[in-house]
Amino acid sequence: MSNASINHASIQLENAAVSNVSAFNKTKRKLMMLGPAFIAAIGYIDPGNFATNIESGSSFGYQLLWVVLWANLMAMLIQYLSAKLGIVTGKNLAEHLRDHLPNKWAVGFYWIQAEIIAIATDLAEFIGAAVGFQLVFGISLMEGAMITAVATVMILILNQKGQKPLEVVIGSLLMLVAVIYIAELFFAHPAGGEMVKGLLTPTFTDSHQIYLAAGILGATVMPHVIYLHSALFKNSYGESTKTRLRTTRFDVLIAMVIAGFVNIAIVAMAAAVFHYSGNQHVAEIETAYMTLTPLVGKAASVLFGVSLIASGLSSTVVGTMAGQVVMQGFVRFSIPMWVRRFITMAPSFVVIGLGMNTTDILVMSQVVLSFGIALAIIPLLIFTNSERLMGEFKNNKWVSYAGVVIVSLVLSLNAYLMVTLTA
């Protein structure tokens, strides 16, 4: 073989090696971009979802599965738009609102309502984790709350090491809950045909179903994670905006499909185990835990409790992060994360100390949250429809139409709730 041939072969090998390294690095960068949607998605399977989904399934069987499905599809679009706003503009939703609201009073109103929503969310999530510890380990609710407090502070410490370790931990907890509900469906044996019918047949046959639908919407489309998700894209990993958006679509799809599966599985389990066994008034998490054992076995109860712990711990951490983003975005001020953690825990300890019904608090908090959805979605749609802000990445007309439909549904449910609750 001539020297020229040898040199040519050597160059080809070098080029192939460089190409392989380049492809590996590109794949690695794309994998590094995955994760923000998993942080957002954990908010969609918080203990508030457990409470509303269990009550829906036990009271009405599979009838409200279509609400869960459509709420999850709406959430998928909204979370992508939130991510897109942050990626394209480099600013989160709260920062854009601060820049565009007419005066400081409007900014103050938006900041206060967003903080209230974050605290109300954290109340449900924190209490849910505490209840999980109480049920699984047979300790008092206050002891469960103290364990929850310590555990969440420890998880938040990871945030000091950067966003990626936190994404891994929260993503792992999301996957744990999903795996648990695969097992729960195995124990429950839901009726497949009835599930499909419930998913595909929109209907309300009872006024309480509309109340629960608002609760499901409030538990599924979470205002605080709309603010948070738009703030999780500070690192571009050297990729173009188009590449980041493409990767984010995949990230949102996977994370929200997992969250949607969990919500559907909770309703299906409650329908199969409670509704069709004559236990049609299981509205409390504690009752659900106790009732599972004689109906489907101790293992199902323990798994239910563990999923509640994983859900509560991860979602209360996300709630704390969202509160921090809201404060920084609206008033350009922040407090140490651990200080915020202790402030937002206080209402939970008060509720527990007063002996209030925890499930009532969980369900009511989700209904209250539904009133904050429109206040987050409407400006999100306005900003992502703006050519001045988004350029070539502004929403197309179909996304805009879908956004209008979502806002109309939210406002209609809110109006119904106002009439119902004040009647």
UniProtKB/Swiss-Prot annotation:
It is found in: Cell inner membrane. H(+)-stimulated, divalent metal cation uptake system. HAMAP family: NRAMP. GO terms for biological process: iron ion transmembrane transport. PANTHER family: NATURAL RESISTANCE-ASSOCIATED MACROPHAGE PROTEIN 2, SOLUTE CARRIER PROTEIN FAMILY 11 MEMBER. Pfam families: Nramp. It is a multi-pass membrane protein. GO terms for molecular function: cadmium ion transmembrane transporter activity; manganese ion transmembrane transporter activity; metal ion binding; symporter activity. The gene is mntH. One of its GO terms (cellular component) is plasma membrane. This is Divalent metal cation transporter MntH. Disulfide bonds: none annotated. It comes from the Bacteria. It comes from Vibrio campbellii (strain ATCC BAA-1116). The chain crosses the membrane at residues 31-51, 58-78, 116-136, 137-157, 168-188, 213-233, 254-274, 302-322, 342-362, 363-383, 401-421. Belongs to the NRAMP family. Keywords: Cell inner membrane, Cell membrane, Ion transport, Membrane, Symport, Transmembrane, Transmembrane helix, Transport.
